Curated annotation (Swiss-Prot):
HAMAP family: MEMO1 (MF_00055). It comes from Aquifex aeolicus (strain VF5). Pfam families: Memo. This is MEMO1 family protein aq_890. InterPro entries: MEMO1_fam (IPR002737). SUPFAM superfamilies: LigB-like. Signal peptide: none annotated. Belongs to the MEMO1 family. Transmembrane segments: none annotated.
Length: 267
């Protein structure tokens, strides 16, 4: 059994289970009794002290089904353009989560999707989502991690629609992992991000992709967002709803150079 060990436990989040629990309790606070069942969510992937609260605001509100597809960007440059994790399980301080092998085989029928471990070895964007899922899941679940590089819009859109058709047969959640604007003043980040948030609220992936390029908006997961939103549309989603927006300055006190974080639910 090939188990991916945590690459960023101890840096992005505590590697000790009890310390992780304490931080989660601090960040997440009150958990609503009523849960939402979205087609997809968008959550950030920075260190928990920076973006954990925004991620929590989404995760604590949703029902987590038996299958979770994780879509994230490739920060390392390793692996294939559309990299579907080829191992058996992922580990975090909360334990081991199995990979959904049957779902993987269906996804690998897409021409540009490849089985791969290299893109996932050191990639943090999907790993940091797992402890949130483990904390709030009310039953066992399996995952399918997919890392996507900056592919052309038509490829991302087409893959998203393919993924959506596959997931029509499943009880599944799509998790899109992305931070928003990087290393700009907080006011500039908000103005730029509002352009992309507006597109995502309307599920307009073409506008999302090309305005990110046109205005040089450094949303690292714009391509995973195109894939995930197109999938959600196939599954019946009609809108995106902003749950939370924050930036690193809220933690550091320095608003002159921030990374911005967004939490969204797609229904």
């Amino acid at each position: 059994m090939r188990v991916r060990e945590p690459a960023v436990a101890g840096t992005f989040y505590p590697k000790d289970k009890e310390e992780l629990n304490k931080l989660m309790d601090l960040l997440c606070g009150f958990e609503p009794k009523e849960k939402i069942k979205p087609k997809a969510i968008l959550v950030p992937h920075a260190g928990y002290i920076y973006s954990g609260k925004t991620a929590c605001e989404v995760y604590k509100r949703i029902e987590i089904p038996e299958k979770v597809v994780l879509l994230g960007p490739n920060h390392t440059g390793l692996g294939k353009p559309i990299s579907v994790y080829s191992g058996d399980a992922w580990e975090t301080p909360y334990g081991v989560v199995e990979i959904d092998g049957e779902l993987r085989e269906k996804i690998l029928k897409y021409p540009y999707a490849n089985p791969d471990e290299y893109a996932h070895l050191y990639e943090h964007s999907l790993e940091v989502q797992l402890p949130f899922l483990q904390r709030y899941a009310r039953r066992e679940f399996k995952i399918l991690p997919i890392v996507v590089t900056f592919v052309e819009y038509e490829v991302a859109k087409d893959f998203g629609r393919f993924l959506g058709e596959v997931l029509k047969e499943e009880d599944a959640l799509i998790v899109i992992s992305s931070d928003m604007s990087h290393y700009v003043p907080a006011e500039e980040a908000r103005k730029k991000d509002e352009i992309l948030i507006s597109a995502m609220e309307r599920l307009n992936t073409e506008e999302l992709y090309f305005k990110a390029v046109q205005y040089n908006i450094t949303m690292c997961g714009v391509v995973p967002a195109v894939v995930g939103i197109e999938s959600a549309k196939v599954l019946g989603a009609t809108k995106g709803i902003v749950v939370d927006y924050s930036n690193s300055g809220d933690t550091t006190g320095d608003y002159s150079q921030v990374v911005a974080y967004l939490g969204m639910i797609f229904l």
